[in-house]
Swiss-Prot record:
Matching SUPFAM superfamilies: Trimeric LpxA-like enzymes
Entry cofactors: pyridoxal 5'-phosphate
Keyword Ribonucleoprotein recorded: no
Domain of life: Bacteria
PANTHER family: 2,3,4,5-TETRAHYDROPYRIDINE-2,6-DICARBOXYLATE N-ACETYLTRANSFERASE, ACETYLTRANSFERASE
UniProt lineage: Bacteria, Pseudomonadati, Pseudomonadota, Gammaproteobacteria, Pseudomonadales
Organism of provenance: Pseudomonas amygdali pv. tabaci
Family listed: Belongs to the transferase hexapeptide repeat family.
Name of the protein described by the UniProt record: Protein TabB
Sorted UniProt keywords: Pyridoxal phosphate
């Protein structure tokens, strides 16, 4: 039986697994988590323009919590103790490992094991959870959170205090997806499986969930759960037709990216200049 089939079958019986069965699951689970760390296994992939969730990844992660015990994390000067079932990704890394990975990690960045960080990425003091994927040349700015299984593409800028929601349960729910070349403004939140398509610009303080109306100012079209490619989106509100005097939060597509917008959100290659 393949590791995938073994884990799929074990997940269906997760409440009845014996101690011996859990011990036998450790090697395939550790193999799977290592594949997540290398970016070979992903919680979601684009297939013909549509993002498809791989539920196996969530089952793998959830089962790993059954096979591990909480332990005190290794401490270094200035780092508080932790008590968790997962180690931190960089806990055992040395200078050579960081050079090989071609990433920059500022003090205060916390990345749990099982997350993938691609070459050229820059991590300011942020939190990145298990199963997350961060693409090449992407910056995760200060106090931002990339939730479990969230997918962030290449050459994105995730500004300070942004929250990208994670999802492990329900199993079939899609994770948040941020495609390539996206700029997300400070203190924005993207959650509940929302997809932000390539090249979009999300303004400061925009909240996007599955039920958030995304209104195109030019056409009046209302959509949910997906920001179109190259859209420029800001926070807005609209009147509640059933209750005059009350307005409901929404997001507004004010235009599509032009050269003026792109110049304001252009990435600075100097901060990504890592020798390879």
């Amino acid at each position: 039986m393949s590791n995938r089939a073994l884990i799929e079958e074990a997940f269906e019986r997760r409440t009845q697994l014996t101690t011996e069965e859990l011990s036998a699951l450790v090697p395939p689970i550790e193999t799977g988590l290592a594949a997540l760390e290398r970016g070979e296994l992903r919680a979601a992939r684009a297939q013909e323009g549509q993002w498809v969730c791989d539920t196996f990844v969530k089952k793998l992660i959830l089962l790993s919590f059954l096979t591990r015990e909480n332990t005190v994390g290794e401490t270094n000067p200035g780092r508080p103790k932790s008590y968790d079932k997962l180690p931190l990704k960089f806990e055992q890394w040395d200078d050579a490992a960081f050079r090989d990975a071609c990433i920059r990690v500022v003090p205060g960045a916390v990345v749990r094991a099982g997350a993938y960080i691609a070459p050229g990425a820059v991590l300011m003091p942020c939190f990145i959870n298990i199963g997350a994927y961060v693409g090449e040349g992407t910056m995760i700015d200060t106090w931002s959170t990339v939730g479990s299984c969230a997918q962030v593409g290449s050459r994105c800028h995730i500004s300070g205090g942004v929250g990208l929601g994670g999802v492990l349960e329900p199993i079939g729910d899609n994770p948040v997806v941020i495609e390539d070349n996206v700029f997300i403004g400070a203190r924005s939140e993207v959650a509940e499986g929302v997809i932000v398509r390539s090249g979009a610009v999300i303004g400061m303080g925009v909240y996007l969930g599955a039920s958030t109306p995304i209104i195109d100012r030019a056409s009046g079209e209302v959509r949910f759960g997906e920001v179109p490619a190259n859209a420029v989106v800001i926070a807005g509100n609209r009147a509640d037709p059933k209750l005059p005097g009350v307005s409901l939060a929404c997001a507004v597509i004010v235009k599509y990216v032009d050269e003026r917008t792109r110049s304001k959100t252009a990435l600075n290659d100097l901060v990504r200049a890592l020798s390879r």
